Amino acid sequence: MFKRIRRVLVLAVFLFAGYKAYRVHQDVKQVMTYQPMVREMLSEKDTPANEELVLAMIYTETKGKEGDVMQSSESASGSTNTINDNASSIRQGIQTLTGNLYLAQKKGVDIWTAVQAYNFGPAYIDFIAQNGKENTLALAKQYSRETVAPLLGNRTGKTYSYIHPISIFHGAELYVNGGNYYYSRQVRLNLYIIKCFTLFSTSG
């Protein structure tokens, strides 16, 4: 009886893992449809941003499934949902990322500070420059709690559940109105995911 239950559980785990792998593969394929557009726009601009990073950010933001694929409306207009076409979204996203990367170079901080600043805003780069010059989860969480959330109305440190493979090891929560302090780590993870799946697809 117990052996049968164990077999069923193992089978269920394998089926779930297979389904998730399939979904991730489909998401990667969707994101990769923007590769030519990203490549073209990067070639038009003097930028330290690279194709792999931009694609990983698209994966993180929307998995390529919305008009504003890089969720760049707010950086362009100060309001959300003002961009609804992919080209404008990617162009604005690259412009914002480029500004962050150049500011990060100027301040002597790491590239992942610039990536996290895509979610928090460029003032985060100054914060990291004054606190060790390297983006860490602890500093991102502190900035979310003490700067971003209060600025947007959450002065009590109120949190909400946030389930993600990275967050589950760090409390599985975010601050209300505090942005996403896991953002740069998610982009890094998604960069590796895209590399792995595209390598697998190429070799296959």
From Swiss-Prot:
GO terms for biological process: carbohydrate catabolic process. It is found in: Cell surface. Its main location: other. One of its GO terms (cellular component) is cell surface. It comes from the Bacteria. Gene3D superfamilies: 1.10.530.10. Disulfide bonds: none annotated. Pfam families: Lysozyme_like (PF13702). Signal peptide: none annotated. PANTHER family: LYSOZYME, PNEUMOCOCCAL VACCINE ANTIGEN A. This is Pneumococcal vaccine antigen A. The gene is pvaA.
